[in-house]
Design a protein with these regions (language model features):
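N-terminal accessory scaffold of Fe(II)-dependent oxygenases
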Residues: 1-230, 238-247
Length: 247
């Protein structure tokens, strides 16, 4: 059903035109190839190993937090039947997690490994500087998400987001802020990553359990990103993010 949803609008923008386009922007849009010249994008085109090598070479010598899936073959980082998390948090050096991701590419039963919202300046040397966007006077938070093939439930964020797919492929399914009542949000005090998430499996919705989600789908948009593509996700827009490739 996601393939039948309207596509997020695409715009042709030079990197230097992004800051002006973002001023006052309140609806999502995609820019193909905005970050095509990023070193990580170029490495990713050579394959997962090249992208992982670049990240490992610039990682600081410190422990990185990672989410490790508890159930083999389950790519959703979500709740289990008892409303506990279906993953555990662990700390370790980045090469350890990258090796686990590489192993997962060859083994469909390997647990999901996901590093979420890692501050590029705190955890890497030179990575943020080499992978920036021209945002004018804005002082953005620059974070990176690294993982094996994962599926992240619909959630929202307070800041505006410009998300770039640097390696692999991603599918974003977006819902406007006012659709919160039709997304069946989970408990506010018990969340996978600090923000309430939709209890609906967007890829395979159970309309008997979540009948109002049919209304949310009437307002949904979808975008599939290739390496170097970027999407603007406005403040408070709900976004469900799915990895479509191994890394």
């Amino acid at each position: 059903h996601l393939d039948r949803l309207p596509r997020v609008a695409e715009e042709v923008l030079a990197p230097e035109a992004l800051a002006e386009r973002l001023t006052g922007a309140t609806t999502p849009f995609v820019v193909r190839g905005l970050a095509a010249d990023w070193p990580l994008v170029k490495a990713g085109r050579q394959g997962g190993d090249a992208a992982r090598d670049l990240l490992a070479a610039q990682a600081r010598n410190r422990a990185f937090p990672a989410s490790i899936g508890a159930q083999a073959g389950d790519d959703r980082l979500f709740y289990d039947a008892a409303m506990a998390m279906n993953f555990r948090m662990d700390m370790g050096p980045l090469p350890q997690w990258l090796a686990a991701m590489a192993a997962a590419e060859a083994d469909a039963t390997a647990p999901t490994v996901y590093l979420s919202s890692i501050d590029m300046g705190d955890y890497f040397t030179g990575l943020a500087e080499a992978h920036s966007l021209e945002l004018g006077a804005r002082q953005p938070l620059a974070s990176i998400w690294i993982g094996s093939r994962t599926c992240i439930a619909a959630h929202n964020d307070v800041p505006d987001n410009v998300a770039v797919c640097a390696a692999g492929r991603r599918r974003f399914t977006l819902f406007p802020p006012e659709q919160f009542a039709n997304l069946y949000l989970g408990p506010l005090e018990n969340t996978p990553a600090g923000r309430p998430v939709s209890m609906v499996d967007v890829r395979a919705p159970d309309f008997a359990a979540h009948p109002r989600f049919a209304e949310a789908l009437q307002h949904a948009q979808v975008a599939e990103l290739e390496p170097g593509d970027a999407i603007f996700v406005p403040s408070l827009w709900w976004h469900h993010v799915e990895g479509l490739a191994a890394f």
